[in-house]
Structures are given as structure tokens and as C-alpha cells.
């Protein structure tokens, strides 16, 4: 870690908070994650066929290791380039980091669910939530739509904001790009479907490992956000529920931020859900909380989320400030 990395991170968090992922920009340019997806798709098409489970698993291991190595190499090259460019390189690096963060874009997508419910009722909420979750929206009633939006916000706070920021802080651009490649691979091939059970095994397991520290850190950031927006009791509940109920989730990591958000808002989250016609039967997280979530709870979740993001930026700034004053 270096002080410059934290300074870049603070600037990147501010840029992402203010600008996000504007449609006008990415309609004209290709987002880097799209290139990651295309690279993963090439390996998937070439190697994920015509072999037994053991060979497919080995091919999947080779695939993700090659992709991670390529990402790290790209990060090293960009580091060298930005170092040579001096102040311009600093700005370009901050913009690059901001591209891989998801504060404003995530909040905007989640807010659209509340807006959809208020303007077009259940169908409006279902349409908006279908853009951010994989579950079947037709199976969701209004509280289910609200829970799905809040769960997505909490989970993606961990792997869309905290994890990329953490891996950048630990290993610079190589760490950030490797994490984003791994996370993209997990979303594309890390499923337990027959097609990817073996080929995507390594990507899924490595993604679980890479997200482990961020998921735990996100609990304290959500608790801090709850403290600033909802008081001490909400912050305490966020930590208590996360410690108690995180294991109710099928994911080893997603349960931490989702349980923290459930405690912060005093609502129930997770529970039985339908994905592709298959019901995932899990207990409710924070079962003692309110059973009926509303659009107002989505607004409250976004407020806590933004305070948590502010806490992350402030913590990074605190690490930098003493050196700037020397």
C-alpha cells in the first residue's frame, strides 16, 4: 500500500459518487467489463465442452488463472504508463478506478424500483427490479420487490464498491483489474448449473475467497451508515444481526451485508426465492424484523448505503491527510 493509492482512491470515490456510469458515455464507448466478458466468453466457448467433469474443472482452473494473469499484466502496464505521465497520469488513474466502482449507478438502479412502485404500482416495481436481480419478478409481491431491491443494494455494496476499493488499496491497478476479472467470471460462469458446475468451479471458489474480507468490512461500513442516518441502536442492530444471521444465506459472503442492512432497517430480508423456476428455500434474515418492506424502506436503504460509501471515502482520506500536512 502507498499513500498515493489512497489519495487516488479518495478522488475515484468522489468521481464515481458524482458521475457514476452515465448512459451517454457508455453508449459511445465500450465499458472495460464488456471486454472482460468477451475474453471469458472466448475461453468458455473453446474449452467448456467435450470432456468429463474432472477435465472441465482443470480447464476452468487454467482459464481463470490465465485471465487473472492477463489482468495483472494489464494493471502493471497501466501503472507504468500513469507513473510516466505524472499529474495527468494521477487523474487518469483516478478515472480508471472510478470506472470500476458502482456507487451512483447502483443507487440509481435501486431508486428506480421505488419510483416504479410509486408511479406504476407492482408492475412498475417488477420491471425495475428485474434489471438488478436474477430472481423471477413475476413471483414477487410488493414487499418481495422491495426486499429484492434492498438485498441487491447491500450485496452489491460489498462486491461493487467495497471489494474493488479494497483490492485497489492492497494491490493497486493490478489488484483492482484482477478482482474485476474474477468477479465478472463468477457472474458469467460461476453458476451451479449443469453447464458450469465443473468449468466455473474455480472462478466461483476464488471469487468467494476474494470477497471474504470485503463482505466482513461492509458490515461495519453499513453500521456506520446506519449510525449517521438512523442512530446508535440501528448501528448496533446491523452488527448484531450480521453476526447472528449471515449464515442463513446460501452465499458465504452475501449474507454479511444483507444481514447488516436488515438489522439497520429493522426488516426481514432473503427467505424463499425463485430463480428460473427453482425455489431456493432459505430462512428469513432478521426474522424478528418487520415482515412488510415498502418503497420507503428502499429509500432508507439507499440513504444508509450512501452514508456507508461516505464512511469508506472518509476513512481513506484520514489515512492520507497526515501526509498531506507534512
UniProtKB/Swiss-Prot annotation:
UniProt keyword terms in alphabetical order: Cell membrane, Cobalamin biosynthesis, Membrane, Transmembrane, Transmembrane helix
Pathway: Cofactor biosynthesis; adenosylcobalamin biosynthesis
GO CC annotation, single: plasma membrane
GO MF: ABC-type vitamin B12 transporter activity; threonine-phosphate decarboxylase activity
Annotated localization: Cell membrane
UniProt topology in membrane: Multi-pass membrane protein
Listed InterPro entries: Cobalamin_biosynth_CobD/CbiB
One Pfam family recorded for the sequence: CobD_Cbib
Domain of life: Bacteria
Spans through the membrane: 58-78, 81-101, 157-177, 304-324
GO biological process, one term: cobalamin biosynthetic process
Family designation: Belongs to the CobD/CbiB family.
PANTHER family: COBALAMIN BIOSYNTHESIS PROTEIN CBIB
Biological role stated in the UniProt entry: Converts cobyric acid to cobinamide by the addition of aminopropanol on the F carboxylic group.
The protein, known as: Cobalamin biosynthesis protein CobD
